[in-house]
Amino acid sequence: MPANMTDEELLAAHVAGDPNAFSELVFRHRDRLWAVALRTIGDSGEAEDALQDALISAFRRADQFRGDSQVTTWLHRIVVNACLDRIRRNKSRPTSPLPEFDSAELALPPGDDVIEQRETQLIVAQALAELPDDQRAAVLLVDIEGYPIEEAARILDCPAGTVKSRCSRGRSKLAKRLEHLRNPNIDEPDQEPEGGHGAQ
């Protein structure tokens, strides 16, 4: 496949029957899609399955791409939805720290050593996991992946105001949950009981 083909051209070529176009599209974006899946679910096995589900769905539904957003936005939407579906179905919980994610991203104090930083990552990952699904997806896309509100809204298929609200609520919960990391004199809070997932 020509390297200078745009994502839109590759997707159109796939729909037209080119057997290599979709593979090239996946090759371009798989690392980013994988990072989103892993950060959303937290478990590498579940993330791999969710990403596979998403790519199969994108492969089969390519003819439904309307062109009202970028192909990458469309792909991310499918991946996020696949992850949220799997979370709701399996009630997955993170068992490992998020990749390429450190305490600085939430303005946390750096650890004195690798072990302390790893423990901090585990705590942050668990705090993210305790957010309702929709709030976690919004926080991950906007605050960790760096998407603008408007693009995150397109990925999540909801109004920009809803994304802002979910981010605000999610940040507030994270700040409360992680306050003990900023202030060592504060005890770590008890984990909230499960059952709030999916709330807006």
Describe every region a protein language model picked out.
Residues 15-16, 39-44, 53-70, 89-92:
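Sigma70-family region 2
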Residues 35, 49-56, 69-81:
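Structural recognition of an alpha-helix C-terminal capping motif at a helix-to-coil junction
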Residues 45, 126-137, 141, 145-162, ...:
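Helix-turn-helix DNA-binding module
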Residues 60-67, 77-98, 109, 116-117, ...:
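Arg/Lys-rich amphipathic alpha helix in sigma70-family domain 2
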Residues 12-35:
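A short, charge-rich alpha-helical start-of-domain segment used by transcription regulators
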Residues 9-13, 123-132:
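Short amphipathic alpha-helical boundary/capping segments
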Residues 10, 34, 44-61, 145-147:
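Conserved RNAP core-binding helix
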Residues 3-7, 93-120, 187-198:
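Internal acidic/polar
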